Amino acid sequence: RVVELGGWNPLVVSSQRFTLHTRDGRVYPVISGSVPPHFLRASGGASSLPSVSDIVFDAGFANQEEANAYGVFPGDVIIPESETILTANQKNVISKAWDNRYGVLMIRELLENVKNQELNNTLIAGANVQEEVGLRGAHVSTTKFDPEVFFAVDCSPAGDIYGNQGKVGD
């Protein structure tokens, strides 16, 4: 059984490769199953979408004892296999969770630019979670550190992709 950490779209979780990370540092490949289309019919024939809890994640272990023998226990995490790549023309980057990666990159750039500067204040940088569902991570950070100034770095999905209304850049 898998419990979601953060927001997961079941439409992109099905039939994907993942890596299982054990608490003692071992890593194993995992594949997620997909619900066959004919099982996606709700009562009355209407289509229904699976939830992440409906999806099977398979690391190839025959049973719990075998998984335990390989150091796999409840609470170990699986993460999607994901590669960040350049497009053919080398002008754009393709990646999942781009908003998170972009935010961390901007924080890294900031820290690189101020690392040799004498600051008149304390600079604290961090990466937070669950901004889509109430800024929970940012709330914890601001409560714990009580900053005088707080900058959140994030971005929104692009609205200028092929087929959308409006012009490129809107």
Where are the model-predicted features located?
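N-terminal hydrophobic/helix-forming segments and targeting peptides
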Residues: 1-170
